Amino acid sequence: MIEIDHVTKSFGDYVAVADADFSIASGEFFSMLGPSGCGKTTTLRMIAGFETPTEGAIRLEGADVSRTPPNKRNVNTVFQHYALFPHMTVWDNVAYGPRSKKLGKGEIRKRVDELLDIVRLTDFAERKPAQLSGGQQQRVALARALVNYPSALLLDEPLGALDLKLRHVMQFELKRIQREVGITFIYVTHDQEEALTMSDRIAVMNAGNVEQIGTPTEIYDRPATVFVASFIGQANLWAGRQTGRANRDYVEVDVLGSTLKARPGETTIEPGGHATLMVRPERIRVSMDAPTGDVAAVRATVSDLTFQGPVVRLSLAAPDDSTVIAHVGPEQDLPLLRPGDDVFVSWAPDASLVLPGADIPTTEDLEEMLDDS
């Protein structure tokens, strides 16, 4: 187990990580996700030993290693640039670590052959790095980092140098390799798809703070803050006020020019308090007629349509001029819509979530965060 015990890291007056407090289980695929400057890489560097906490402690298997040098910690790091030895074969690159530890030849061969089999590079053992694709080079770097059996492997945006299609392939390869070797992987990324695809749990970070830790499903379906909701996936976020409780299970919020029943979040909001209602675009139904049953519904006017393959992305204007985004698939069986058409948009109360506050990041804010990552 790895414990981050109330860790703060400051550089002068700048606080890069503020009171981070969480643990990572042995054998877990744990991701730290967030925009540039959120503190994820600094946290990884403190686990690796490249930075020292200003406050708090880092423990590996119960031992405080906060001031232990990197070479004395049983962890290895894979960076975006793999730093393979160009003059060595794949086999010799992987064997470098065990040789430097002066293991026996038989043990070295056993370990290297085992790792090359796991990363599916046995047939490439005699090639040089320049003869490999980017994905193959990355798997060599993984094998080299794993061959000494570290207690944890730290990965700092290792897929960033690959093209989009290869990144998708390598996401599944990384998860497969992690399951086969059973070693803790701690993965840093600003790419939400990578984190959602591979992780057992995710820590979402923003401005030095850990905003939420949970499984991919928990992070996506029940974000704890407006930032998490806006950063993970696509979400409709409408600012309003919570007026009270509808019943034991739901609250009422004034948004979109209506009072709507919605699922409360984890944070208690007093009646009249600022609130944000979140609904994912894929949870919204669009209909020509007023919906029936226990749903939240408002009138809306089609502003724009974009074909996106399996769905059509509809942008609609609500009565209060707020924008509603809906992803409409063929199962909704709608007639051909055009800008200016009046429709109803609706969703089940369980498909919504009320979050505290009404400070919603703009699209430009999020794009700037990601551009800097």
UniProtKB/Swiss-Prot annotation:
Disulfide bond entries: none
Any one GO MF annotation of this record: ATP hydrolysis activity
EC id: 7.6.2.11
Ranges for domain ABC transporter: 2-232
Record-listed ATP binding positions: 34-41
Record bears the keyword Cell membrane: yes
InterPro entries associated with the record: AAA+_ATPase (IPR003593), ABC_SmlMolc_Importer (IPR050093), ABC_transporter-like_ATP-bd (IPR003439), ABC_transporter-like_CS (IPR017871), Mo/tungstate-bd_C_term_dom (IPR008995), P-loop_NTPase (IPR027417), PotA-like (IPR005893), PotA_ATP-bd (IPR017879)
Membrane topology category: Peripheral membrane protein
Keywords per UniProt: ATP-binding, Cell membrane, Membrane, Nucleotide-binding, Translocase, Transport
Domain of life: Bacteria
PROSITE patterns: ABC_TRANSPORTER_1, ABC_TRANSPORTER_2, POTA
Entry's Gene Ontology cellular component terms: ATP-binding cassette (ABC) transporter complex
Compartments, as annotated in UniProt: Cell membrane
Enzymatic reactions: ATP + H2O + polyamine-[polyamine-binding protein]Side 1 = ADP + phosphate + polyamineSide 2 + [polyamine-binding protein]Side 1
Primary localisation category: membrane
Function: Part of the ABC transporter complex PotABCD involved in spermidine/putrescine import. Responsible for energy coupling to the transport system.
PANTHER family: SPERMIDINE/PUTRESCINE IMPORT ATP-BINDING PROTEIN POTA, SPERMIDINE_PUTRESCINE IMPORT ATP-BINDING PROTEIN POTA
Subunit structure: The complex is composed of two ATP-binding proteins (PotA), two transmembrane proteins (PotB and PotC) and a solute-binding protein (PotD).
Family: Belongs to the ABC transporter superfamily. Spermidine/putrescine importer (TC 3.A.1.11.1) family.
NCBIfam families: potA
The name this protein goes by in its record: Spermidine/putrescine import ATP-binding protein PotA
The encoding gene: potA
